[in-house]
């Protein structure tokens, strides 16, 4: 059973929007709704998303996550094959929670001021952007599908998952039933 008081606490929270630094080329992390550093420090690898040329494949079952395959994945549509400033984002009809750039041609001051980059063949998704990237290459909607699954770099990481338990029988975000 979730406590209704939790939503009251959430409503009173200070969202701490913004950044400590005025430039993306200097130190300082963004915090939004108590999500620490949603972009600008490292590229975040998004597992469960594979690209094969212009096609997007998504997987909702963590046990089936794999790279360079469509097995266990759903075709979520197509994306732009061009690099550039994002002009349009598409929503998948087969996975309505999935969105990805479908058109580039914007600028740093128009449409969505973040970039999309894509390579050909099998690719994986990084989002956000790393510290030290140019100011145009970091942002909440910055999509990078230029890298293969074998790529490794110190500016690529993943977000840890933290959740709290409230009451018996609460399910974790991955679906496991957890007894109190």
Give the location of each predicted region:
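Short, small/polar residue-rich loop motifs at catalytic or cofactor-binding pockets
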Residues: 28-30
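Active-site microenvironments of metalloenzymes and redox enzymes
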Residues: 7, 51, 65
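Single conserved hydrophobic/aromatic residue that forms the stacking wall/gate
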Residues: 1-6, 10
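C-terminal, surface-exposed recognition/capping segments
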Residues: 14-15, 22-25, 38-51, 69-180
